[in-house]
């Protein structure tokens, strides 16, 4: 991607850092610390192709495709725009991503029967199959 323009969201620093980490993972640039979710453009230590990184609100990214060569897009916005991340993406976070959604409860509530039942249901093979069928690889179960 010579002289590619990349977009990321300044209004959402967490996902901006995730985007840079993905670009590092893809070998397009190198960050000081490719595990630092708070990474910004200032943390790029190597940009051998002089990519221009333009920041844009995450929800606008799918609409910007005609103006750029490459964009980093959150899965929810990609799906809303009719994209198929499993086919359209060059790089995706995998099930080992530390940014997977989690089930969180207050300390002391983790052993409540209804919480245990919910966790068991949400992490079942039935739910895994539902995710696979519904999202066709765009969302990867992290359990």
Please identify what each model-predicted range represents:
Residues 20-22, 42-72, 77:
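Short helices/loops that flank or line small-molecule/ion binding pockets
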Residues 17-24, 122-142:
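Periplasmic-binding protein-like
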Residues 11, 75-77, 107:
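Short secondary-structure boundary segments
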Residues 69-70, 82-96:
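Short beta-strand->loop
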Residues 7-45, 125:
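Bilobed "Venus flytrap"/periplasmic-binding protein-like clamshell domains
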Residues 7, 100-114:
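A bilobed periplasmic-binding-protein/Venus flytrap-type ligand-binding module shared by bacterial periplasmic
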Residues 1-6:
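Short, small-residue-biased leader/transition segments that mark boundaries at the very start
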Residues 18, 111-121:
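Short amphipathic alpha-helical coupling segments at ligand-binding clamshell hinges
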